[in-house]
Every structure is written in structure tokens, then in C-alpha cells.
Amino acid sequence: MSATPQAAHPRLSVQDVSVTYVGRGGEKTEAVRDVSFDILDKPGHGEVVVFLGPSGCGKSTILKAVAGLLPPTKGKVLLDGQPVGEPGRDRGMVFQAYTSFGWLTVQENVEYGLKLQGVAPKERGERSREVLKEVGLLDFAGRFPKDLSGGMKQRVAIARTLVNKPRVVLMDEPFGALDPMTRWGMQGLLLDVSRIEDNTILFVTHDVSEAVYLADTCYVLSSRPARILHRVDIPNFAERDVHLKSSDVFRAIEKKLLDMLYAPQPAA
């Protein structure tokens, strides 16, 4: 008698999360309202979930709540069933701004967090070289950030996050400052890395094409306060390369998302 397959449990569960900022004068700004979603744990399959919405709508605030950097005003965030109350190594964050230390080499930047954790030098070296190889920077391990292009600096940031082996990687418009060709290359790199590392990736963007290209699932958000308007499951394309972006099916999904973004929204 064969065993009954067990249903996948949520790796990440965000339940009725609202976030309100309080200014110095006591004024309140509601950034996120009643956001709920589950991301299932699918062993051997890196999941990319994209939040698509207008600038300033509250996308980044959702990431900060998941990261433990900003406690929800209401609701809760669970990672593998455990409440998130503070930052932890099981979550890593990549920002749009370059965050490398200029006085450290590429490899030293990647190892920095491991060093603070007390990881032995031999293990630090092995783990850093492994992720540098994944992001295509092993030959630049001894270089300094000033010697790198913008895309290479973001590869360093991704490697520095991956070396900690997080369950969830949070990416806040990490490719927004890059030129289009470099951005396409970084998008492809991200998809490759997600398959290797088996991470859950939460990715914030206001670029519709980027959302379609990267996402397994896309959540379309309202203007502030951020609410989930639609969930769109993106087809599992056989090949995700630059030619996909000119295909009829890709453009049809882009149009669908654009229509959702610009449709009249329910009153806040």
C-alpha cells in the first residue's frame, strides 16, 4: 500500500497584515492594508513571487514586514510555521542601492556576514567561492567594488545574501538602476540561481515585463495603502530567454497585467 502524498505546507504565510507609519508629529500613514498570501514549500523548486504595483504603493513595506525589519500594525508573518518578529539569517535582503564595503574585496564582502557569525575561515572560503561561482564572479574574488560594473556589484549583493543559505530572499527592485541589457542578464542569472539554491524569492518591481519574465506567481497591488487586487499565475515557460519577451503569449500576459494595474480600483 503506497503512502498518501503529503500536501505541501506554506514556507511563508502572511496573514491579514496591515502596516501604519506614525510620523514625528503623530500623523498616521497607512502603507499596507489586510495583505494575505501563502507561498508553499516545494522541495527542489525555487519559487519566484513578484509584487507588481505603482511606485510608492507599499510594496517595499511588505518586504520589510517579512524581513522582520518592520512589525505589522495588525496581522502576522509566519516562516515555516514560526512567527517572524525580528531579522534572521533565514531571510536575506537585496536592495536597489549598492551596499558593498569599498575597502573589502569581493570575496571578503561575501564572507563578511559569515565572519560575524563566527564561521571558521576554511568554511567561509568554501562557501563564498561556491556562491561566487554561481553568480559568475569567481574570477573577480580578489577585486574591489570600485573595479566592478553596476551589474557585477549586484551580483556581489546576491552572493552575499545566498552565502547565508536563507530560506527566503527578499529583493527590492534590485535591477532598477541597471541599463536594459544588464538587467536582462541579471534576470536570467536570478532564475538560474533560484533553481540551484531552492530559495523562495519575493521580488518587488513596477516593471511589468520584468514581472512576467521572473514570476511563477504575480500579485498585482493597489495604490497606497497596498492591497492585493489580483493573483496571476504565470505559465511555466519551457525557455525563459530574451526571445520570450517578444512572443505573443508573453505580450498577452503583459497586457493582462497592465489592464489590471490601470483599471479603476476599489475605494481605499
Regions found by a protein language model. Name each.
Residues 1-28, 267-268:
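ABC-family P-loop ATPase nucleotide-binding domain
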Residues 67:
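Helix-to-loop junction immediately C-terminal to a conserved catalytic motif
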Residues 75-86:
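Conserved ABC transporter NBD signature motif
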Residues 104-112:
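Short coil-to-helix segment of the ABC ATPase nucleotide-binding domain corresponding to the Q-loop/switch region
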Residues 111, 115, 120-140, 192:
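Conserved ABC ATPase "signature" region
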Residues 143-146, 164:
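Conserved signature/switch motifs of ABC ATPase nucleotide-binding domains
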Residues 169-172:
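Catalytic Walker B motif of ABC-type/P-loop ATPase nucleotide-binding domains
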